[in-house]
From Swiss-Prot:
Gene3D superfamilies: 3.40.1280.10. Its EC number is 2.1.1.177. GO terms for cellular component: cytoplasm. Its main location: cytoplasm. The lineage of its organism: Bacteria, Pseudomonadati, Pseudomonadota, Betaproteobacteria, Burkholderiales. It catalyses: pseudouridine(1915) in 23S rRNA + S-adenosyl-L-methionine = N(3)-methylpseudouridine(1915) in 23S rRNA + S-adenosyl-L-homocysteine + H(+). This is Ribosomal RNA large subunit methyltransferase H. Transmembrane segments: none annotated. Keywords: Cytoplasm, Methyltransferase, rRNA processing, S-adenosyl-L-methionine, Transferase.
């Protein structure tokens, strides 16, 4: 199974990339994690609908057919660590690859959010995109460690 993190926005600070890379290399071979950064649409004088449409096109191009789509959304379901671990286990048992989508500065197109298989949120707080990448991969690693009985997560 593969976890694909699709993030709108390409540049993140070095510290965020270093932290992301550190967690990404911890995953076992049977649970591959891949990051695909997609370009943010330049604002200019474009309408929000135009920005959403351009970013949606790039996001969809980055996600292979048959992949389960999970969007990170402030209105999504809040999960505990144990609940995320169970969700990860369910995804693995389902056998499909999973794409976790992080929207750009304006979020994700409402129709794309609604069409996703699932909507989850990491926090009630508004977080910078670089931080979201790091928090997401850390929480996915933590969920894996719970399921694997690895000592990373402690009760």
């Amino acid at each position: 199974m593969k976890l694909l993190i699709v993030a709108v926005g390409q540049r993140v600070p070095d510290w965020a990339q270093t932290a992301y890379d550190d967690y990404a290399k911890r995953f076992p071979p049977e649970l591959k994690v891949e990051l695909k950064a997609v370009k943010t649409e330049p604002r200019g004088s474009k309408t929000l609908e135009t920005l959403y449409a351009a970013e949606r096109e790039r996001i969809e191009a980055a996600i292979p057919r048959g992949t389960r789509v999970v969007v990170l959304d402030e209105r999504g379901t809040s999960l505990t660590t144990k609940a995320l671990a169970q969700r990860l286990k369910d995804w693995q048992l389902g056998g499909d690859d999973v794409a976790l989508v992080i929207g750009g500065p304006d979020g994700l197109e409402p129709a794309f959010r609604q069409a996703a298989h699932e909507r989850i949120r990491l926090s009630d707080l508004t977080l910078p995109h670089a931080m979201v990448r790091v928090l997401l991969i850390e929480q996915l690693y933590r969920a894996w460690s719970v399921n694997a009985g690895h000592p990373y997560h402690r009760e």
